[in-house]
Amino acid sequence: MIGKEVTVQDIVLELSEVQPEVLPVDLFCEEELPNEDTEEELDTERIVFKVIAPCGCSHCEVKLRVFVQATEFGIRAFQQLLTGDLQLLCPECRGNCEHGGS
């Protein structure tokens, strides 16, 4: 280095002295990105799920089985509904409820 300020020309990197096992990597590898049509097909693929949920009444211990066909996004949204504001009712508890709040 000549002078008080470092310039790019003064910096010399020799990786072979620091770590001999470090080799340059070809960043243009043979990897291919999937085309957009394939991604859309995967997103719209519907799978059959069996959902087991408890009855929404506090005094009932019935387990309800529901079979649905949904995408991965759809089943996750359904799961969020069931663990949030939406509750399924068994036929007996449904008969004891008033419909529509009336």
Swiss-Prot record:
Span of the annotated motif Nuclear export signal: 75-83
Any single Pfam family the record assigns to this protein: E7
Subcellular location: Host cytoplasm; Host nucleus
Sorted UniProt keywords: Activator, DNA-binding, Early protein, G1/S host cell cycle checkpoint dysregulation by virus, Host cytoplasm, Host nucleus, Host-virus interaction, Inhibition of host innate immune response by virus, Inhibition of host interferon signaling pathway by virus, Interferon antiviral system evasion, Metal-binding, Modulation of host cell cycle by virus, Oncogene, Transcription, Transcription regulation, Viral immunoevasion, Zinc, Zinc-finger
Chain intervals for the UniProt region annotation (E7 terminal domain): 1-44
One GO cellular component, as annotated: host cell cytoplasm
Molecular function GO labels: DNA binding; DNA-binding transcription factor activity; protein domain specific binding; zinc ion binding
Zinc finger regions, unnamed: 55-93
One Gene Ontology term from the biological process aspect of the record: DNA-templated transcription
PTM (free text): Highly phosphorylated.
Family: Belongs to the papillomaviridae E7 protein family.
Task of the protein: Plays a role in viral genome replication by driving entry of quiescent cells into the cell cycle. Stimulation of progression from G1 to S phase allows the virus to efficiently use the cellular DNA replicating machinery to achieve viral genome replication. E7 protein has both transforming and trans-activating activities. Induces the disassembly of the E2F1 transcription factor from RB1, with subsequent transcriptional activation of E2F1-regulated S-phase genes. Interferes with host histone deacetylation mediated by HDAC1 and HDAC2, leading to transcription activation.
Protein name: Protein E7
Taxonomic path: Viruses, Monodnaviria, Shotokuvirae, Cossaviricota, Papovaviricetes
